[in-house]
Amino acid sequence: MKKKTVSLLLSLAVCLTMLPVQGVFAAETETETAAEASESTGNHVENLVIGTIADQNVFNSLTQSDAFGRMNYNGFTQGDFVYRDENNNLQPYFWKSFTISDDGKQIDFTIPLDAVWHDGEPVTMDDVVFTFEYMRDVRKNGSLQNLTEVKVTGDDSASLIFSEPDAYYWINSSCNNNACVYAKHIWEGIDDPTTLDGPEAAIGCGPYKLVSYDSDAQVSYYEAVPENAFLGEITVDKVTVQSYSDETTLMMAMMNGDIDAMYNYANPIDADVIDTVKGTPDIDLGESAFSGCYQMEYGKDRAPGNDQAFREAASFAIDYNQLATTINGEYGKVPGKGVIPPSCKGYDESLGSLEFDADKAAEMLDEAGYKDVDGDGYRELPDGSPMDLSVIPQYSSKSMDMRNRIAEVIMNSLDKVGIKNHVDSDSISNSEIWEDTVTKGNYDISITLTTSGMASYSTAFRYFMGELREGESSWLWGTIRDDSFRDNYYAMTQAVNDEQYIENNQKLQKYVADTMAAEALCWETAFFPYRTDKYTGWENYPSWGAVHATTWYRLTAK
């Protein structure tokens, strides 16, 4: 393979340019160990080495692709407007301050006047106004469809004016999706951000700039930008992001001291891998309750998923203890009927937990008319026609093995009570076929994952929606086409305060518990390990880990 090592020389006076990395530099960076790279001068961390299993091929500040895009969930190279703290509360980041009006129709905010783009250009209010107009008009951000004006009120202050109470909705649903300021001099006139693949695509105004990357070695290098110290002094001078083929290899690198911490968005280290790391000196497992979860939804556009009696019976057929062990080892727990885990805002413990009772499931299926008419060991539909459920685990290039194992447990459980089923092999062959299948509702059981980012506000209920509100265009993977469910979902996401959010969130929990339209498969304990021998100031955010927006300002050398 031809070497694809590149270096990005970021000048304060001219736009970003790309030059080949000299061979001596490439050799040094590829063989340098974390022990050598992480030497610190004074109290600063000289170079923090972060491991990931995400690929490093795309470096575009307006996408969420690969390690670069996912690292920017942490206010890394981009000026994210806000971030979520360890308690899941929103805090200012690029915005120096912000307030939401009582009616939820306005956000007032201030910005720094000394921030710079990584090519040396100043960040201005023109960039901020451009950003919101670009997100609304070009990127068609659904949560900004009712944004009527970006009103500049001072040199460093402005207001977002909405015609509907969407302020709370936008800021909460967007904060984990790279809601950041865009460089007008780069993105103006670009209708499709993914088409920009030159070095200028990586320019941001975050606390770090991309210096170089080596796509063969799957490593990238970053340096701090002192002007963009949004939370105070930046204490980590440089960052190296190194990709690994899988979790086992990544954790071996950490045990060997080659990396200091790991970051995989919404993908904590699997329990079986964690068990091999336990007891290793100077490694904190980074344990916390996980707010995300795997879930399954019954396809309700056709029989038998459109029959609540079938869904209730099938629910009792599933071995939740085996699922919990499969997904999270000894740490997994049987989930509740309301889908969302206890670590999520608004969790309703009164709904109780799911139960496994195969005998009860068989009895309920008989009563609902799902009987083995022809004596082949499998039940038919109540009208006597064959029943063979199509099961589709969500496609993933990195965690398909786990999703297939989950599907196997569910399928074996259903098979034991006479429900014939099969995996839709075409749908799990690639992401395009899978998405086309779920979007059309062509499934009987869909297995998906709510990420911790989605769980923080949009919740698992977003995955179950079969209809959006009028005027909104976005992905649809669910088959709940009930007006009350849709209305409660938007009442939750458009709430103007936490009280309204929780009230409507609990209505959604009760809906799925009462209808068994969908169910969680396991409540997990998350592990995001990090080394403790060289640095202090680590903070393990629940469901997120030790790498987040405040890491760059709080981590110091021992």
Q: What are the language-model segments listed below?
A:
Residues 49-102, 133, 203-204:
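N-terminal lobe/hinge region of extracytoplasmic solute-binding protein
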Residues 52-74, 94-96, 121, 165, ...:
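A structural "hinge/loop" feature
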Residues 67, 75, 85-89, 177-233, ...:
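Gly/Pro-rich hinge or "lid" segments in bacterial periplasmic/extracellular proteins
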Residues 99, 143-190:
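Surface-exposed binding/hinge segments that line
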Residues 134, 226-273, 420-422, 428:
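Ligand-site clamp/hinge motif
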Residues 215, 372-452, 526:
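Ligand/substrate-recognition segments at binding pockets and active sites
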Residues 217, 224, 317-349, 402-411, ...:
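Detector for C-terminal structural segments
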Residues 305-306, 318, 334-374, 397-404:
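Structural transition elements
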